[in-house]
């Protein structure tokens, strides 16, 4: 089987550590994503910053003085991939009470590893939607400065949510009086939280419009932020030049978020025909996490959470090890085109 080399050239563009001199790569095959054609024997030339300066047939390319092309004439090259739903500072093996023992600095260190794995898996741009303590902001800045190897990142910092909701931490008893950084109640408090996360470096705003699977005390399909709260968040974010992404499994929460002016809906697990029509009408992006369930197993989240997960997906396999879902939203997206559909993995890290 012909070797496929993912993101050959954009891989290097987004890794400042990789560059100090111009270079070139000779590709046996190169996917032209604009035309949809697979081109043969192409030369990709880039400058010292990693920016591509030319793509042309190898026979007609004159290389800059002193540049010797990397020979990948037995490989297929394609542009870098984009993942619009990641949590790179998280550990896929830490759920429930085990998360309480992980410090914010430790999550930042985990992010360094996951960013490297993500880039080497072929993803050169990611949107990170939800991280404790602005660890994703620090990771993004480290990558931009050339201190850390990783993809271009658009980050949200802490996700915004209601008290006791999916974006809160509900694991500690009442005497601790603990709540997550993004908790807000009411439209004005929600506006203030938008301003706060933008102040500390958020490129995008992440909110929880519905309950989730891995959070204690809520249900995946239950609405959380009200329509009025989400309208305030969207208005404030847009005023500050930021887009808003809403975690939403439930049918009603999906439609409320779209009506509120939210820019993208994450998961869309129980979207119905009306929700799809609303998304088309409002120009809302639907983001389906294609790899969320394979990330989870009985060993990592337990039977209880897997049972909750089964309420919002149609399992192809319900073995005690892994459950591979047929996400209803992604099927609906294909059937109800044309609407704006994007793919996120929900992955915390890619396999080595």
Residue spans for each PLM region:
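N-terminal low-complexity segments that are often proline-rich with Ser/Thr-Pro
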Residues: 303-352
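Metal-associated gating/positioning segment near the N- to mid-region
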Residues: 75-147, 163-166, 170-173, 228, ...
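Boundary at the C-terminal end of the N-terminal hydrophobic targeting segment
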Residues: 18-23
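Active-site core of metal-dependent hydrolases
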Residues: 163, 208-309, 321, 327-328
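Histidine-rich, glycine-flanked metal-binding segment
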Residues: 30, 35-78
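Bacterial N-terminal signal peptides
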Residues: 7-16
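Active-site mouth loops of central-metabolism enzymes
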Residues: 97-109, 173-192, 243
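Divalent metal-dependent hydrolysis catalytic cores, especially in the metallo-beta-lactamase
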Residues: 110-136, 150-159, 202-215, 243, ...
């Amino acid at each position: 089987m012909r070797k496929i080399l993912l993101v050959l050239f954009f891989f290097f563009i987004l890794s400042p550590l990789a560059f100090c001199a111009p270079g070139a790569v000779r590709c046996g095959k190169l996917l032209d994503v604009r035309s949809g054609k697979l081109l043969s024997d192409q030369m990709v030339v880039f400058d010292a910053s990693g920016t591509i300066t030319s793509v042309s047939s190898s026979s007609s390319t004159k290389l800059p003085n002193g540049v010797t092309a990397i020979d990948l004439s037995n490989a297929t090259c394609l542009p870098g991939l984009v993942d619009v739903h990641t949590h790179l500072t998280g550990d896929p093996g830490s759920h429930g009470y085990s998360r309480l023992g992980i410090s914010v600095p430790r999550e930042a260190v985990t992010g360094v590893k996951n960013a490297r794995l993500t880039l080497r898996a072929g993803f050169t741009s990611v949107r990170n939607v939800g991280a404790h303590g602005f660890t994703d902001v620090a990771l993004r800045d480290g990558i931009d400065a050339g201190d850390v190897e990783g993809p271009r990142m658009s980050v949200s910092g802490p996700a915004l949510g209601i008290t006791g909701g999916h974006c809160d931490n509900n694991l500690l008893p009442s005497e601790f009086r603990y709540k997550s950084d993004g908790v807000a109640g009411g439209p004005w408090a929600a506006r203030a939280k938008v301003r706060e996360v933008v102040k500390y470096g958020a490129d995008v705003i992440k909110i929880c419009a519905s309950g989730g699977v891995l959070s204690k005390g809520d249900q995946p399909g239950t609405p959380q932020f009200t329509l009025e709260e989400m309208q305030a968040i969207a208005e404030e974010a847009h005023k500050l030049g930021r887009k808003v992404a809403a975690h939403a499994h439930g049918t009603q929460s999906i439609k409320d978020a779209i009506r509120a002016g939210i820019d993208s809906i994450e998961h869309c697990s129980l979207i119905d025909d009306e929700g799809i029509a609303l998304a088309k009408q409002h120009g809302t992006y639907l983001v389906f996490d294609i790899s969320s369930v394979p990330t989870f197993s009985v060993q990592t989240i337990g039977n209880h959470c897997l049972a909750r997960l089964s309420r919002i997906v149609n399992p192809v396999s319900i073995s005690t090890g892994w459950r591979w879902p047929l996400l209803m939203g992604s099927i609906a997206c294909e059937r109800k085109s044309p609407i704006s559909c994007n793919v996120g993995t929900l992955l915390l890290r890619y396999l080595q």
